[in-house]
Amino acid sequence: MAIQQEIIAALGVKPTIDPAAEFRVSVEFLKAYLKKHIFVRTLVLGISGGQDSTLTGKICQQAISELRQETGIADYQFIAVRLPHGEQKDEADCKDAIAFIEPDRVITINIKSAIQASEATLSEAGIVLSDYVKGNEKARERMKAQYSIAGMTAGLVVGTDHAAEAVTGFFTKYGDGGTDINPLFRLNKRQGRALLQHLGCPEHLYLKAPTADLEEESPALPDETALGVTYEMLDDYLEGKTIDAAAARVIENWYLRTEHKRHPPVTVFDDFWK
């Protein structure tokens, strides 16, 4: 099997989708998981104002609303978490995303002071963080806050990882990659966009240039610039289409180099790294 087909199979991507049906797949998946794990009462998700968290948030709120109605358990709750580092440049988009999702509860935690404290403590020990590593600190601090909220509310931390992100490993290990459940897994970027269009989401939330926006020396650096390929190329590749050979090599190199991110901690029984 060619590596492209191996990747497509591993990530479960379909060449075409029915947006309405895929929305229901994700909603029913979350509902079934919570019904199986009866001690879980909340879903916790960080909202950035971008496509992925907006879609995931809408899925979470729909699942929780249906669970309350179907089970009669009023304790079920979706908690949307705002996690700015200082002043967020796309604050208006975040507010629009929250308005679209209509979460049961919104919690805002500014992580800037926590990052500054961590940076200062490490510096005292002789470890001076680069801008890149500090960016990963931000991603991990955001997840730490979400897990604290989940721990106090009998919750699960929900991830936004999807196929176009997973194939490149474009997430922080034990940061935004460290979650309990990922309802977007199997969808690529354009498919996620199609779901939001189906749901009537304001288009500026899914047409904006995706950015992790973690590095202060390169603020709002577009994902596509960091990756060296466009999401259109990634989506075409994941749908089994033939793309430019150079772009395909970039995607495959990312996939192979970041395998450790998609795998539990390596043990003596693993051989994927050899």
Curated annotation (Swiss-Prot):
Q: What residues bind Mg(2+), as annotated?
A: 52, 165
Q: What GO terms fall under cellular component here?
A: cytoplasm
Where in the chain are disulfide-linked cysteines found?
Answer: none
Q: Which InterPro entries match?
A: NAD/GMP_synthase (IPR022310), NAD_synthase (IPR003694), NH(3)-dep_NAD(+)_synth (IPR022926), Rossmann-like_a/b/a_fold (IPR014729)
Q: Give the residues the record marks as binding ATP.
A: 46-53, 160, 189, 211
What keywords appear on the UniProt entry?
A: ATP-binding, Ligase, Magnesium, Metal-binding, NAD, Nucleotide-binding
Assembly:
Homodimer.
Similarity annotation: Belongs to the NAD synthetase family.
Q: What is this protein called?
A: NH(3)-dependent NAD(+) synthetase
